[in-house]
């Protein structure tokens, strides 16, 4: 069968939580004992066992969504369709349920088609991700491929945080490109869907791949000037916003380690990256 998990819960208001979960099992002709066993197991999975006798109106929105999720899973379906089912849950429970759904998928071999606008959730849970834009699939592949090797500007900007620099292809040798930015500076990149010299391009670089320590940059790679706008402390990492190539929204992330160089607003630095981490994509 097919299990469904909706963003708007779709629970029967006149039934208790237990009856909501038992109903699809009863329709399938399961015995009362088996229904009760499956209902108990599904409620325990979403940490809602003590609410079995409540009605939906007596539950919070987050609790109702958890019940709806349990109902989608209660009969161990072969396929589950989910429309942002975890959107109403708090962060800790949402992360717990992500791994529970993934574990259920691995244990039972069910296929889950999962709609989400949370890119982190998609990267965490998926074997394959389909990125849609205007009803068309832009790219389909495993999470590491979509994140590390986006095929166009939309995917690069949609999956994870991303920097985009506009420029023109100065030199092109196979997939190795030299790009002249709009402010005249040169950077190295990997050509993706760019075919010829003189073509306008958007170069995509992930914030965590940007380096500012000379010893971490590849030899002979071009570096460019950056001015620090602000630095935000995020615990395990530091997030610096830079002015690069006349743009104020360039982001660099680096580890918060003992003895890490401290950057200050107004400071000028040189930044660079490995050419394979910068992807020359279709223009803006």
Regions found by a protein language model. Give the residues of each.
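Asparagine-centered polar/low-complexity signal
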Residues: 8, 20, 133, 162-163, ...
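Non-catalytic connector elements of ABC transporters
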Residues: 162, 171-284
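ABC ATPase nucleotide-binding domains
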Residues: 1-3, 7-157
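Short beta-strand-centered aromatic/proline hotspots
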Residues: 167
């Amino acid at each position: 069968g097919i299990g469904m998990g909706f963003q708007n819960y779709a629970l029967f208001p006149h039934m208790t939580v237990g009856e909501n979960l038992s109903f699809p099992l009863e329709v399938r002709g399961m015995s009362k004992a088996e229904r009760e066993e499956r209902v108990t197991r599904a409620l325990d999975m979403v940490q809602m066992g003590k609410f079995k006798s409540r009605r939906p109106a007596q539950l919070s929105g987050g609790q109702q969504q958890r019940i709806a999720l349990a109902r989608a899973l209660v009969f161990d379906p072969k396929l589950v369709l989910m429309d942002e089912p975890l959107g109403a849950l708090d962060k800790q429970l949402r992360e717990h349920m992500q791994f529970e759904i993934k574990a259920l998928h691995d244990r039972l071999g069910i296929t889950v088609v999962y709609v989400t606008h949370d890119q982190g959730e998609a990267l965490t849970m998926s074997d394959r991700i389909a990125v849609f834009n205007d009803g068309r699939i832009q790219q389909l592949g495993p999470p590491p491929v979509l994140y590390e090797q986006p095929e166009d500007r939309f995917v690069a900007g949609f999956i994870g945080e991303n920097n985009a620099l506009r420029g023109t292809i100065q030199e092109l040798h196979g997939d190795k490109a030299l790009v002249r930015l709009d402010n005249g500076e040169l950077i190295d990149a990997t050509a993706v869907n760019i075919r010829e010299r003189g073509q306008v391009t958007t170069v995509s670089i992930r914030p965590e791949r940007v380096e500012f320590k000379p010893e971490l940059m590849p030899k002979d790679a071009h570096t460019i000037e950056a001015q620090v706008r602000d630095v935000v402390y995020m615990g395990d990492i530091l997030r610096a916003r830079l002015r690069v190539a006349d743009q104020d929204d360039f982001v660099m992330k680096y580890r918060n380690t003992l003895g890490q160089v401290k950057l200050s607003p107004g400071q000028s630095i040189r930044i660079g990256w490995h050419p394979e981490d910068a992807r020359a994509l279709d223009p803006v």
